[in-house]
Regions:
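Active-site proximal loop and beta-alpha junction motif in alpha/beta enzyme cores
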Residues: 1-74, 80-291
């Protein structure tokens, strides 16, 4: 047993308990795979991360990302939250103004703009439209008609998201999915707000007014699907799809989490060929654990 530094971070929010919580073990070296998996099950958060010395000389640190059931090669809110914890604990990047994280998909670049961190969206491992049988299955799960889905796309960038676009943000917010009816889908849903009519609340200024509403559903530990409060990996792949297809401008804000009482905000910006996914963080817990 060893005493290790620990933080719990709320990601994609400026206000505590309105984003997506992340557990970060800052001193993960020496823990076995089984110990990491067991601790992630114990936290029961959507993800728990363990920071380690990098094996890639270009990286500043290495991260391993666990859900309560599996290890992930990449995930978005753990990327931003882990970087926030690493920097706040005294981490010094090799290059001023940017951080390089090593994870299961390789290197992920991050940058800081004021208090906000953003990561460079990794390339999608699979894109293109979904097959029709999958689209119909997703429609049944969401409780909508097939015709309500106006577009669809593979958004696999580690997590194998299968994304559908509805005609409006209001339709996304109105969804009442049958969470127990599926067990192996990873479903992302997006819909646009009318211009200038983003969902207000929780101190939104004009700069934070969302252009899109997003919801995400993933396999739950006890069976069926669960809803994720705010999802960086899905928003990254959605941005690549929506901007590339002309459905979104090169800079926008997405809202996520309203159905769970959250108010996540994901800041998207395309620069050249890179899409940056940004968010604020709040550290709610700092301390030590014995593991």
């Amino acid at each position: 047993m060893k005493t290790r530094r620990f933080q719990q971070i709320d990601v994609f929010t400026q206000q505590p308990m309105l984003g997506n919580a992340l557990a970060v073990v800052l001193d993960g070296e020496g823990l076995s795979d089984a110990q990491m998996a067991a601790f992630a099950r114990w936290t029961q958060l959507s993800e728990t991360t363990f920071l380690l010395p990098p094996t890639d000389t270009a990286a500043d640190y290495r991260v391993r990302i666990f859900t309560p059931t599996v290890e992930l090669p990449f995930a978005g809110h753990p990327t931003i939250g882990s970087c926030h914890a690493w920097l706040s604990a005294g981490g010094q990047p090799k290059a001023q103004g940017k951080v390089v994280q090593q994870c299961g998909v390789g290197r992920v670049r991050l940058r800081r703009q004021g208090t906000r961190l953003a990561f460079a969206a990794p390339p999608r491992r699979k894109d293109g439209p979904l097959d029709e049988a999958t689209v119909e299955r997703i429609a049944r799960f969401l409780g909508v008609q097939r015709g309500d889905i106006v577009d669809h796309q593979h958004c696999d960038n580690g997590p194998a998201w299968q994304a559908v676009r509805l005609a409006s943000a209001a339709q996304v917010l109105a969804l009442r999915p049958q969470l127990g009816s599926e067990s192996d889908l990873e479903v992302g849903v997006v819909g646009a707000y009318p211009s200038g009519a983003g969902r207000a609340g929780h101190g939104d200024g004009d700069a934070d007014a969302p252009s899109f509403e997003v919801r995400a559903f993933f396999p739950a530990a006890g069976g069926g699907l669960a809803e994720d409060p705010v999802t960086g990996s899905l928003n990254a792949a959605l941005a690549q799809w929506l901007i590339g297809a002309g459905h979104a401008p090169p800079r926008y804000v997405a809202a996520q989490g309203a159905a769970l009482g959250r108010a996540g905000r994901v800041h998207v910006e395309q620069e050249g060929s890179t899409v940056w996914i940004g968010g604020d963080c709040v550290a709610l817990v700092r301390g030590e654990l014995t593991l």
